[in-house]
Every structure is written in C-alpha cells, then in structure tokens.
Regions:
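Short, helix-capping/interhelical loops that line the mouth of catalytic, cofactor-
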Residues: 2-11, 57-128, 132-134
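C-terminal interaction segments
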Residues: 239-293
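A glycine-rich beta-turn/hairpin centered on an aromatic-Pro dipeptide
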Residues: 183-228
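Contiguous mid-protein beta-loop-alpha structural module that forms a pocket-lining wall or clamp
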Residues: 100-174
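Alpha-helical initiation/capping and key positions within long helical/coiled-coil segments
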Residues: 12, 16, 47, 51, ...
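Non-cleavable N-terminal signal-anchor transmembrane helices
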Residues: 1-50
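Short, contiguous alpha-helical
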Residues: 32-81, 140-196
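Acidic/His-leaning functional-site neighborhoods
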Residues: 220-250
Length: 293
C-alpha cells in the first residue's frame, strides 16, 4: 500500500525540484565545451544532458497522459505498452538509448532551455492535481501517485546533475534532504507499487530470506523493513518482524551506492554505511540483491 502524501511533503518535494532544476540548468549553461568526455557508461556529457532533458519531456508527459513527445522520436513505441513506455523493466535501457540517439540536439544551453520549459509546465500541472492522484508510470502495470512522479524527476535531476558535474570536473554537492525526499517518495512507492520481483536481482537473491531494517540518517520517517523472500521484495513500515540486519546510512551515500555512482566499500570505510544485528554480514550483499534499470 502506497502512503498518502502530506501537504508539507508535497510542498517540500516541489521546492526541492525547483532548486535542482535551477542548479542543473545553470551548470549546463556554464559548460562551454563538453567535448567527448564520458560521463555514464558509454554516454558522454552531452548525451547525459540529452537523456535528462528527455526525462523532463517523458515523465511529466506520462503524468498528464500525453506521450506524444517520446512517440515523435520513436514512433514504433506508440501503443506498445498501453499508457506506459515499456512493457518490462528489461526494455527500459534499450529504449532510453534509442531515444538519446534519435534526437541530435547536443547544445547544452538548448537542453537547459528545454528542461526549464518542461519544468515550468510541470509545476503548473501540479497546481491542478492532487499529489495522491495515480498515473501510469514508465513500465506497464505500474501506477504511481503524482508525488512519486515529482520525486522521480528529482532523482533524475539530482543524479544526472552529479554525473554532468563530475564529467566537467566541477564540484557538486547533493543536498541530503533532497536525497531523503526522493528515496521516501520515489524509491519506496515504486517498490510498493511494482511486482515484488521487478527490482530484485534474481540470481543474487535466490533462496535469500532476510529482513533489513534500513535507517536513513536525517530521515526520521525513513525507517523501513526491506523484506527479501527468495527473489521477491516487500517494503514495510517498521513492525515486530524479526530483523536480520540493521543498516544505518548517510542519505547521499545510500543514493550514490544505489545508483552505482559510489562503491559501497568506500562508503563503509568513511562510516557512511554501518551495520549491526543478528547477521550484519548481510549488509555487504544488500546492494547486490537489488536490480536497477
């Protein structure tokens, strides 16, 4: 069950998103020559910026029931997954790669303008809807509240802003409060709304029955049980369930480890990830149990 969003959380998530949009667009406009520097995988800096701009086209489009901006780039996707973009999470990587290749724009200032324009319209849309109103998400069969769409955009903007800044050799601070918000209002609703096996690494989690008590520092409400059951995952509010491993995590470190931008061992060495309990050694395997697009 996905929790409802308080008025205060709804305002905080929009404020955080506005702040990150301002930061990332200013960053893009400040980079004069992105060159061919690799930023994420095989994507260079400009391609990551393009991907982020397409996220700003597609995610708000899904929330308003208009997928035309993405279908214009990939006409063969129209109607393939109903009101969503893909049928299965395994298809998402290929489709996002094709989208980036389909749009030749690589001028960073133009991409910044696109992000700003999409953000401006999205915030207008937010004034007309409830944060708890459900909409079809990227993957067919998953519906999420508008608040989760907002924090999905926050996740994309924070993480790819970090990618772009690193590729450009810039220092980039991730606000811990923003990391808590996107985990609380995007990660958790997504896990709760998805098939229990969708976000699990089936090979790594096969046969594993373990409950992790995850505590994100600075997030008083982010104290949840991640329950793995032979390849399935549920997220529950803290209860009397017997815990195998307690995890205390710095929110920024948890975010970067989750998205494989930082080694978990580096975070452990810095005290950003700590474990205790009946089976503390399971902490070293926690990230390997999770699958991400």
């Amino acid at each position: 069950m996905i929790m409802s969003t308080s008025r205060l959380d709804w305002q905080h998530s929009q404020d955080a998103l506005r702040d990150e949009v301002g930061r990332v667009t200013a960053l893009l406009r400040s980079i004069r020559d992105p060159g061919a520097i690799l930023a994420v995988g095989e994507w260079d800096l400009a391609e990551v910026a393009m991907h982020l701009s397409q996220g700003w086209l597609g995610i708000p489009g899904l929330a308003r029931g208009d997928r035309s901006a993405l279908y214009d780039l990939l006409p063969d996707r129209a109607g393939v997954a109903g009101d969503s973009l893909v049928r299965d999470i395994a298809d998402l990587g290929d489709v996002t790669t094709r989208l980036v290749r389909a749009d030749p724009e690589r001028h960073l200032s133009m991409l910044a303008d696109r992000i700003e324009a999409c953000a401006k319209q999205y915030f207008v849309d937010c004034t007309r809807q409830s944060p708890d109103e459900l909409h079809p998400w990227l993957i067919q069969g998953i519906t999420l509240p508008l608040a989760a769409f907002t924090c999905h955009l926050l996740n994309e903007t924070v993480v790819h802003g970090y990618d772009i800044a690193r590729a450009a050799g810039r220092r980039w601070r991730i606000n811990p409060a923003h990391a808590v918000l996107l985990m609380d209002q995007f990660f958790v609703p997504l896990i709760q709304g998805a098939d229990p096996r969708m976000l699990v690494n089936a090979d790594a989690a096969a046969g594993v029955k373990a409950t992790f008590d995850v505590r994100i520092r600075g997030g008083s409400r982010f104290h949840l049980h991640f329950v793995f059951d032979d390849g399935a995952l549920r997220v529950e509010t803290s209860s009397a369930r017997r815990v195998d491993c307690h995890l205390s995590a710095d929110p920024v470190a948890f975010l970067l480890v989750f998205w494989q931008r930082q080694s978990q061992w580096a975070a452990i060495a810095k005290g950003q990830l700590m474990a205790w309990g009946r089976k503390p050694w399971l902490a070293a395997r926690f990230r390997s149990f999770l699958a991400t697009p």
